[in-house]
Amino acid sequence: MTELRQRVAHEPVAPPEDKESESEAKVDGETASDSESRAESAPLPVSADDTPEVLNRALSNLSSRWKNWWVRGILTLAMIAFFFIIIYLGPMVLMIIVMCVQIKCFHEIITIGYNVYHSYDLPWFRTLSWYFLLCVNYFFYGETVTDYFFTLVQREEPLRILSKYHRFISFTLYLIGFCMFVLSLVKKHYRLQFYMFGWTHVTLLIVVTQSHLVIHNLFEGMIWFIVPISCVICNDIMAYMFGFFFGRTPLIKLSPKKTWEGFIGGFFATVVFGLLLSYVMSGYRCFVCPVEYNNDTNSFTVDCEPSDLFRLQEYNIPGVIQSVIGWKTVRMYPFQIHSIALSTFASLIGPFGGFFASGFKRAFKIKDFANTIPGHGGIMDRFDCQYLMATFVNVYIASFIRGPNPSKLIQQFLTLRPDQQLHIFNTLRSHLIDKGMLTSTTEDE
């Protein structure tokens, strides 16, 4: 007994802080594991039949397969008609529509996370998500306004100040949101709150960044906006039609209804469609000219002298093809060659944006992101491929098309001090004289 007392007396006793931290870690670990298991069993949003009653009655005698065909077809035509209307209304309306689509897509993705974890009553989750959306939009679109509305910004004192300190203001706004998130952390929900913090930021990266690139593409000329979007739409429709009538071979497990027949048929149909649409649009200045802001009329203008990219040129046809079609040359716009790259990406790589979205939906056991469009799902279901396409088009323009922009260089020049402007003027004049574009007589005058 004496021995036992001595052994107990000599055993080290763990400090209370360690015990407390261990129990805290245990509680946190149990909470995280419980969160994951509860998330698996939590009720998830499912797709509902929101087909208009008129269509339901008209198609009641058809099988579910053909009913879905007609519902998708009719509503697709309606969306295409709406697309034509907003194109007719001009670039300003297009930009507003892009912003609305961005907000709706963000709402659909954030709502999925909220529905999965709604039972945990996470503090400030939705408020902070929308606040971060506001911050990121302010950062991206503030840069755009400064680039494309420079004269207007410099004319108005408040806008000039906001433009000058734009990045600092953006960073400050984000820091406020970051501090709010840290202050909202709750002991029993640490891991889950960081999950949702990452969820929000990945959503912002996918949705806001891509929509920002869409608007940049639009400013390069409406043709860079319309052709890529139309190619994705065409590929989606033609892949569905080829798959519906000829589909036999499954393409990918993530989307069991996708077939190789639809994938290949959609590719060839999209390339042909891209060539035809590019040929038609390249002949109109309103589509090919960059969208610029006119300070005199306070409106957008799309009038310019078309670049060589949109002027008909004659190309020699390879000898092998000459023997088949009997033509030696063909007249086409250089942009049509670029349209082949755009349509190829839209049909071969673009669908992987849809496959990515399918994997996301399978992970959360939902059929669609929302029920906004009957037969199609949510807005995000229609734009999952468009966002990937927007990034490609922006990179393609920057790599192969865009050169130095004289108007932007002049804008930057005008912001310099007078002595800096004079120095650049003298340097440029000396350079032009050396090149033989100015004479010494001109210099003396």
Curated annotation (Swiss-Prot):
Transmembrane intervals: 79-99, 132-152, 166-186, 213-233, 262-282, 340-360
Keyword Secreted: no
Broad enzyme group: transferase
InterPro entries assigned to the protein according to its UniProt record, in alphabetical order: PC_trans, PC_Trfase_euk
GO molecular function, one term: phosphatidate cytidylyltransferase activity
Protein EC: 2.7.7.41
GO cellular component annotations of the record: endoplasmic reticulum; endoplasmic reticulum membrane; membrane; mitochondrial inner membrane
Catalysed conversion reaction: a 1,2-diacyl-sn-glycero-3-phosphate + CTP + H(+) = a CDP-1,2-diacyl-sn-glycerol + diphosphate; 1-octadecanoyl-2-(5Z,8Z,11Z,14Z-eicosatetraenoyl)-sn-glycero-3-phosphate + CTP + H(+) = 1-octadecanoyl-2-(5Z,8Z,11Z,14Z-eicosatetraenoyl)-sn-glycero-3-cytidine-5'-diphosphate + diphosphate; 1-octadecanoyl-2-(9Z,12Z-octadecadienoyl)-sn-glycero-3-phosphate + CTP + H(+) = 1-octadecanoyl-2-(9Z,12Z-octadecadienoyl)-sn-glycero-3-cytidine-5'-diphosphate + diphosphate; 1-hexadecanoyl-2-(5Z,8Z,11Z,14Z-eicosatetraenoyl)-sn-glycero-3-phosphate + CTP + H(+) = 1-hexadecanoyl-2-(5Z,8Z,11Z,14Z-eicosatetraenoyl)-sn-glycero-3-cytidine-5'-diphosphate + diphosphate
Residues found modified as Phosphothreonine: 31, 51
Regulation: Inhibited by its anionic phospholipid end products, with phosphatidylinositol-(4,5)- bisphosphate (PIP2) showing the strongest inhibition. Inhibition is also acyl chain specific, with 1-stearoyl-2-arachidonoyl-snphosphatidylinositol showing the strongest inhibition.
Tissues with expression: Widely expressed. Expressed in heart, brain and retina, and to a lesser extent in placenta, lung, liver, skeletal muscle, kidney and pancreas.
Cellular compartments annotated: Endoplasmic reticulum membrane
Protein origin, superkingdom: Eukaryota
Keyword Nucleotidyltransferase appears in the UniProt entry: yes
Record region (Disordered): 1-49
Positions bearing Phosphoserine: 21, 33, 35, 37
Record text on subunit structure and interactions: Homodimer.
Purpose: Catalyzes the conversion of phosphatidic acid (PA) to CDP-diacylglycerol (CDP-DAG), an essential intermediate in the synthesis of phosphatidylglycerol, cardiolipin and phosphatidylinositol. Exhibits specificity for the nature of the acyl chains at the sn-1 and sn-2 positions in the substrate, PA and the preferred acyl chain composition is 1-stearoyl-2-arachidonoyl-sn-phosphatidic acid. Plays an important role in regulating the growth and maturation of lipid droplets which are storage organelles at the center of lipid and energy homeostasis.
Family according to the record: Belongs to the CDS family.
Name of the protein in its database record: Phosphatidate cytidylyltransferase 2
